[in-house]
Amino acid sequence: APDFSTLELIPDKLKEFGNTLEEKARMA
């Protein structure tokens, strides 16, 4: 069976990744 707790965490990781990219883009 798939691990739904991991699937639920994926959107948060994507949001964190997007925020990090935005911050780096602003600093550049």
Curated annotation (Swiss-Prot):
This is Apolipoprotein C-I. It is found in: Secreted. Its main location: secreted. It comes from Oryctolagus cuniculus. One of its GO terms (biological process) is lipid transport. Keywords: Lipid transport, Secreted, Transport, VLDL. The lineage of its organism: Eukaryota, Metazoa, Chordata, Craniata, Vertebrata. Belongs to the apolipoprotein C1 family. InterPro entries: ApoC-1_sf, ApoC-I. GO terms for cellular component: very-low-density lipoprotein particle.
